Amino acid sequence: MKTILQLLVRAYQLGISPFLGQNCRFYPSCSSYAIEALEEHGALKGSFLATKRLCKCHPWHAGGVDPVPKKSSSKTSTTACGCGHS
């Protein structure tokens, strides 16, 4: 599913985006963000992050640098040093 969604975004980048010009208010562009989010987080969460980003891409938002959040580790340490020992 992730690959299909990435191919759809890539088709947009190659087939539609060149006719619209570079109007994205963010870096990376929304379509690049979508591909990276899908790769990093999978189809479900990646789609959610991409949709959330698209909702921010409008003239009343300042834009700027907005990287894809890194996947958090499932092992969270509760020790002060962060080593994970008990």
UniProtKB/Swiss-Prot annotation:
It is a peripheral membrane protein. Belongs to the UPF0161 family. Keywords: Cell inner membrane, Cell membrane, Membrane. The keyword Membrane applies. The keyword rRNA processing does not apply. This is Putative membrane protein insertion efficiency factor. Could be involved in insertion of integral membrane proteins into the membrane. One of its GO terms (cellular component) is plasma membrane. Residues 64-86 are annotated as: Disordered.
